[in-house]
Curated annotation (Swiss-Prot):
Lineage start: Bacteria, Bacillati, Actinomycetota, Actinomycetes, Pseudonocardiales
InterPro entries: FAD-bd_PCMH_sub1
Subunit and partners: Heterotrimer composed of an alpha, a beta and a gamma chain.
Cofactor: binding details: Binds 1 FAD per subunit.
Keyword Oxidoreductase part of the UniProt annotation: yes
Catalytic activity from the UniProt record: an aldehyde + a quinone + H2O = a quinol + a carboxylate + H(+)
Transmembrane segments annotated in the record for this chain: none
UniProt-recorded name of the protein: Aldehyde dehydrogenase beta chain
The species this protein was found in: Amycolatopsis methanolica
Keywords recorded for this protein, A-Z: FAD, Flavoprotein, Oxidoreductase
Keyword Nucleus annotated: no
């Protein structure tokens, strides 16, 4: 998986990670 170019977010939970993916796309 190659990360898309967006502002890096430090996530502290799976929910936050999923929210970030949902917001920015896969």
């Amino acid at each position: 998986m190659i990360p898309a170019q967006f502002t890096y977010r430090r996530v502290s939970s799976v929910d936050e990670a999923l929210a970030a993916v949902a917001e920015h796309g896969d």
